[in-house]
Amino acid sequence: MTATIYTTADLQRFIDAHVIQAELLRDIGHTPTVPAAALALGVTPDQIVKTLLFLIEPPGQDAATPVVVISHGERCVDKGRLAVRFAVSKKRVTLAPAAVVLATLGYPAGGVPPFGHHTPLPVIVDASVQALGARHGGVIFAGGGDDCTMMRLTVAWSPLA
């Protein structure tokens, strides 16, 4: 299967089509990690969020279920909590390899944005991201479609009920 590879131009079209208040910051340097992104942007690492793809392997199924997790950049995602959420053992929760990330989401690992993916998937937003809304005026940065582009967003968290 050949992966559909999205570009920053594809992400900008998604942002425009969905009227998302986000700004792509292009050509800021090589930013595949949270520390590199923070350094390139001149911000603290606690302003960076990361978008990760996990594979959940339910017993008795031939294929793993991909799940997107958006987390505070300085935190490790607790695979044990994901396992509980999906009623599987912790060993059945793995971080997707780079080739699977590209084939599933359309963006390379290290530059995955929080939205606009090739394949619509369940998304889990870690509670740590909500807490970012109270700091730095709510301004956060996320992957911008490649490892030289970041996206500037503002966290606005409002319960629906």
What are the roles of these predicted feature ranges?
Residues 1-161:
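Extended, low-hydrophobicity, polar/charged segments
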